Amino acid sequence: MFNIKKLTGSILFLFATHAGMAQQTSPVDFVNPLIGTESKYELSNGNTYPAIARPWGMNFWTPQTGNMGDGWVYTYTADKIKGFKQTHQPSPWNNDYGQFSIMPITGTPQFDQEKRASWFSHKAEIAKPYYYSVYLADHDVTTELSPSQRAAIFQFTFPKTDSAYVIIDAFDKGSYIKVIPQENKIIGYSTKNSGGVPENFKNYFVITFDRPFSYKAAVKSGAISKDELEIQDNHAGAVVGFSSLKRGEKVTARIASSFISFEQAELNLKEVKSKTFQQVVDEGKAQWNEILGRVQVEDHNIDRLRTFYSSLYRSTLFPRDFSEIDGTGKRMHYSPYNGQVLPGEMFTDTGFWDTFRSLFPLLNLLYPSMNDRMQEGLVNAYKESGYLPEWASPGHRASMIGNNSASIVADALMTDRKGYDKDLLWEALKHGANSAYPKHSSTGRFGYEYYNKLGYIPADVKVDQNVARSLEYAYNDWCIYEFGKALGKPEAETAIYATRAMNYKNLFDPSTKLMRGKKADGSFVSDFDPSAWSREYTEGNAWHWSFCVFHDPQGLINLMGGNKSFVSMLDTVFVIPSYEGMKSRGMIHEMREMQVMNMGQYAHGNQPIQHMPYLYNYAAEPWKAQYWVRKIMDKLYLPTPDGYCGDEDNGQTSAWYVFSSLGFYPVSPASGEYVIGSPQFDKVTLNLENGKKVNIQAKQQGANQVYVDQLTWNGKPYNHNYIRYKDLLQGAKLDFKMSEAPNKNRGTKKEDAPYSFSNEKIKGK
């Protein structure tokens, strides 16, 4: 996939001025994987861990400060490391699967995670996407690691000792280990998971060392046994030792894993088998620079550069590539849906409820060939399970709501990609829109019978989050309609989805101008508090969800009484005190994150309202979008361990920043348009995959210069509040003239408003 030889001429170097000194560096040097790691159950500042990985890698590696099975695997405030874990965790809420760890120690053999743990300091820690190093003070050992796509190489620098050991922990819930001393090798598997796997699920691993073992033992349920070298148990592990080490001498371990077999794990080991540690490091750095170098940023503020490239790094981790390459060079995958080994693509560990909003549109803009592969993976997921996933980790998970695979599929078609079965995806979309997954309510459409009959899901039929589901289903129906229309499907098939796309109107309450729960008899629920985080909504309230009409803001404006009334409703979101509604239900972390940010009812730490500031563009007051978008970027995104204002969510919250800092955002994925905001950088160059470049300049921008006074496109005045994907694809030069005062004449005409489905229907398209 990646041609390292071509990088010499293609890696883009950035010039950043800091403390009066010019520095020349590469994109990956700005990335801080520790952003967002200062989090806990009660308050998320990202809920991230340092993912040491390749872009979209099958395996990530991370230092482990939490206990075995803890979703908070690494927290910045911790002071001890218990191991270095291979992880596939997309979120602490969904937790991990197939995980195992490795840990160097000195002294006496110790397997217990508390006894083997070591103090560490961030002052003796280096975290980069392609490399991690830390000094383990209690053992006087420096651990270094660098990953490939499916393997990794470790380097342990021990003190002078005859008692150096490496612990391999295959974790509990069913694991296997075998020490093969004649080959300096350990093999094993982990079956630990948090759901979403077939019964035959295993993560097979192989570990080889560069020297013989002076000590070897297997571990059964915590007990070290020198008499056994092979154990299958609830909790298996191994300890191997090395003697006669000189101070500073390095022990190298190479590790690979496979979800298919031990034999495939051996094939995957070839990624690092014949390479030195430095070669793997250099290749990882080059690969990250190729990916991050799709965007070249020039700016005077180094913290913003760190925030940007760290956000782009987070945007290119998930969904992970779950495929493997067999001995003939063919791409295969273990199906997390039916347990079979099958040919072709598979991607996983993403929740479409989060990532349809900006993560996948970002992939379509900057990495369309990668999303092409992801679409083939969706085709395979449908073949293997009968449904498109909504939250995959690695298979179907019971998490969140919506049928937003429709958005993922429809938005990808905007790039006019080829190479996957779009007709089968059409069948998959129709099936998912008219049925419910039998095992849980998060795949397909829970409550579809009511929605299809009444045009909404009633609040009195025991389908929770009914307002949120209904609104998302309406947007999903629009996506299905647009997808079918683009494929040339007959109107007899597509018309029903165009009709259902307007179902959002059925829950609009004219008396409050908000979306409100409605009973089966057509009456609104009586106990309505718009600030209450009630059961009709998903992780939010009426203020958050009433603007979730992504495909038809003009229709929503009409319902609310026109532009002035609509703008007033938007303004109100930022005015109502953040503590309103806090006692409406048991506290969840999203509520606290909104409260402490002190931006009224605007809850950027959660997805439903993230697009809302851009809606001013539809109502002839784009300067308010510019003000709020810039304020959100400046206040809520920092290059620090507490740098997010809620869950990062597999690239979604990061992709919001990436788009917004460029100066535009995909309010309605699959519409082919981006809505203009306030560019944050002096100069940006997008290096599109087709060879074209998009140059964005905003040299007058600053802390106070947040308003767009003028915009030119290829030297000509441009007053619209939107940008079309197809126009960017041709290459473009956008020059923003920024100002401290809003220009209340620019972007105020009806034709300047971005796409709305109501306008499309009026025009008869």
Residue ranges and their predicted role:
Residues M1-Q24:
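Bacterial Sec-dependent N-terminal signal peptides
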Residues Q23-S407, L413-L471, C479, G484-N506, ...:
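Accessory carbohydrate-recognition regions in carbohydrate-active enzymes
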